């Protein structure tokens, strides 16, 4: 739960929390004939200053050009939250069975997989958040 981790960092390491809300990190994904770039802080706040999105992916982080002090602040923050993300206390693990589906809020929850033996097929789909929120409001 990225929000639970962000709240812990906010309470126990307020300076690191501020850095993670302010310093933009670029991510890059290349595969399947596409290149996707995104640049945003790891912890993104809404206009009211409330946490809105947690974005963290050590594998797709791109080259960053930051001043030395900002780079050190960012690395301190990454080291802290990476340790928390990998702490079993903040994880829920579930082995999907054939035909099973899971729906999650990609702005709140981080997701991944552990090692497995054998072959598997996993299909993923993303719904645009604005479309989802709009539709939710229409059906409320």
Predicted regions mapped to residue ranges:
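Active-site environment of non-heme Fe oxygenases that use a 2-His-1-carboxylate facial triad
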Residues: 1-140
